[in-house]
Amino acid sequence: MILYGFAIFLIVIALLPLTQGTHWIIRGWDFIRVQTCFLQALILVLLAFFEFPVDEWQYVVAISLLAAFIFQLYVVFPYTHYYPLRDSKPEDPDSLRQISLLSSNVLQTNEEYAKLIEQVNLHNPDLLLVMETDKNWENGLKELEQEYPTVVRVPLDNFYGMHLYSKYELAETQVNYLVEKDVPSIFTKVYYGSDKPLELICVHPAPPSPTENETSEERDAELLIVGKAVRELNPDHPIIVCGDLNDVVWSRVSRLFAKITGLIDPRIGRGLFPTFHADYWYLRFPIDHLFHSKNVVVNRMERLQNIGSDHYPMFFTFWLENGEKVEKPEIDSETSEEVEERIDEGLERAE
């Protein structure tokens, strides 16, 4: 009977994120779909060998558990090596400019600055985005400014500071507080040698959790405001949105973000690349992201070594296809209404 009770629990938590509920107790189950897939498979095996269904209700539970397991496999399958890549290598990559980006949530209380500097020196990214940075981290990374003459500094001691280091010229840089007054984002144009700059947006919204926001409404609103901003950018320009989004790529809002922007998640066909929590291998999920427009092609995507943070850094190299115009995706009225409703709810809650 204990197995059937656990089976019912696993069915419920697989379905809860499909509801419109935004409380962290509901949204949190979306993060661990991979882990619950393994638990569902284990319970199915145990039922088959040790407590095979006899009564009608037991058959209903067992079949429902199997259906929930198949559903979760369907959700996470695109983020495996067995799924086709969304982008492919350009026909003539040598004619295109290739640049690189390293993104890392460093954990504000982490003082192992040298570990991040070591990774930066090893991979030599053109762009370096670090999050949860305060004045101590700014000072700890001071030596990098010799190689990165352009720096956007937003030091904060609330675990939402952000610094962007660039080897290239940045223009029209804005530090925005889109939803919450103490959670910044960076919007900038990267001039990497082409007359058409790379549009770069760096974000780190607060998650739904028992220690932070009670619901996902603020996070959802920020991601969708960014999504609307992406739609207003020049379609000739390559676009990248990156950072610790505090959301998994298969969530309703992440998929809604991809739908309204047309941006591509390079995890599709490459793997999960779980980045958090670095200290617990059995409880990791992918929440550090990079989304890119169709005129950007990812060449390399790698999770780097632990730097003492609770997040692993991510490293990307990508080709920029100059001059290729990308059409904005059409969105229906129902999608548009959902986007506006979620934004309004998040802004209202953040007041």
Where are the regions that the model predicts?
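Soluble catalytic domains of enzymes that build or remodel membrane lipids, polysaccharides, and related
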Residues: L101, L107-N121, L129-E351
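Intrinsically disordered, low-complexity boundary segments flanking structured domains
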Residues: L15-L16, D87-E91, N139, R252-V253
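Short acidic/polar active-site loop segments enriched in Thr and Asp
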Residues: D126
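N-terminal signal-anchor transmembrane helix
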Residues: F49-L122
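Generic hydrophobic alpha-helical membrane-segment signal
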Residues: G5, L18-G21, V60, P93, ...
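Membrane-embedded alpha-helical segments of integral membrane proteins
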Residues: M1-F50, V54, V61-Q72
